[in-house]
Amino acid sequence: GILLDKLKNFAKGVAQSLLNKASCALSGQC
């Protein structure tokens, strides 16, 4: 449903920002 899609998109956004933070911290390019 729509709610599930919203949850999926939200989770995707959170995961993406976490990945970005992690890779930027690892490479030291924050």
Swiss-Prot record:
UniProt protein name: Brevinin-2Rg
Pfam families in UniProt: Antimicrobial_2
Originating species: Pelophylax ridibundus
Disulfide bonds: C24-C30
Protein task: Antimicrobial peptide.
GO biological process: defense response
Compartments in which it is found: Secreted
Keyword Disulfide bond among record annotations: yes
Expression tissues: Expressed by the skin glands.
Signal peptide annotation: none
Keywords recorded for this protein, A-Z: Antimicrobial, Disulfide bond, Secreted
Family, similarity comment: Belongs to the frog skin active peptide (FSAP) family. Brevinin subfamily.
GO CC, alphabetical: extracellular region
Keyword Disulfide bond: yes
